[in-house]
């Protein structure tokens, strides 16, 4: 995994043609929160900023990937839980949530925000649910690379970049689903029960 040390936050413009693709990316970035630092950084636009004590509600989905450190997450549908490096958090539109790093460890996080009928359909069919927003997929250089690809295409903003980066988001979602389904059978208790 690349050790990027400068935070990068991108908030993207979306055209009517982009919307017709069925999924669009609204924001992408990464930030590194050292131990003892305030969270979140105050460089986000108002609709994305929040205080961990009060949380927030977004109008889009977001995939937050914690690659270093630990912290806490809670939402309207999920009680407070400890999260560690290797956890992917799926935030849902219209769902109150809060998350923050442990002050002793800080954390490194990548995120991508998105919306559209492709993800709405996957949620409707219960591939992803508000009750289970935490996906403990482990650390993956491949997934970090996908986030970095989104960042690269988003910073270049060439024609068709929205279609490219939103398709990468679908790849990440597929990877999360696959990893979680296959990780569940590494639990010896589950394997013993099946046998």
Predicted feature locations:
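Generic protein-terminus/edge-of-domain signal
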Residues: 1-74, 79-81
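Amphipathic alpha-helical segments enriched in hydrophobic/aromatic residues interleaved with Lys/Arg
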Residues: 13, 121-186, 190-195
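Phosphate/oxyanion-binding loops and surfaces in catalytic or ligand/nucleic-acid-binding neighborhoods
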Residues: 28-31, 35, 117, 153, ...
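Short, charged/polar surface micro-motifs in flexible loops or helix N-caps
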Residues: 35, 68-70, 88, 94-96, ...
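Tight coil/turn sites that cap or link beta-strands
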Residues: 36, 47-50, 85-86, 94, ...
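Short acidic-glycine-tyrosine-enriched beta hairpin
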Residues: 77-92
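Ligand-binding loop in jelly-roll beta-barrel domains
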Residues: 80, 94-118
């Amino acid at each position: 995994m690349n050790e990027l040390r400068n935070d990068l936050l991108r908030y993207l413009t979306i055209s009517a043609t982009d919307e017709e693709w069925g999924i669009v990316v609204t924001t992408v970035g990464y930030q590194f929160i050292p131990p003892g630092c305030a969270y979140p950084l105050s460089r986000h636009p108002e609709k994305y900023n929040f205080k961990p004590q009060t949380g927030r509600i977004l109008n889009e989905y977001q995939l937050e990937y914690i690659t270093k450190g630990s912290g806490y997450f809670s939402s309207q549908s999920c009680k407070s839980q400890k999260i560690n490096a290797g956890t992917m958090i799926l935030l849902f539109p219209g769902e109150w949530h809060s998350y923050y790093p442990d002050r002793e460890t800080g954390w490194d996080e990548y995120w991508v925000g998105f919306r559209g009928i492709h993800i709405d359909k996957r949620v409707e069919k219960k591939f992803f649910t508000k009750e289970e927003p935490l996906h403990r997929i482990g650390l993956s250089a491949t997934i970090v690379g996908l986030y970095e690809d989104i960042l690269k295409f988003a910073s270049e903003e060439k024609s068709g970049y929205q279609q490219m980066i939103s398709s990468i988001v679908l790849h990440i979602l597929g990877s999360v689903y696959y990893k979680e389904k296959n990780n569940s059978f590494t639990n010896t208790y589950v394997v013993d029960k099946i046998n």
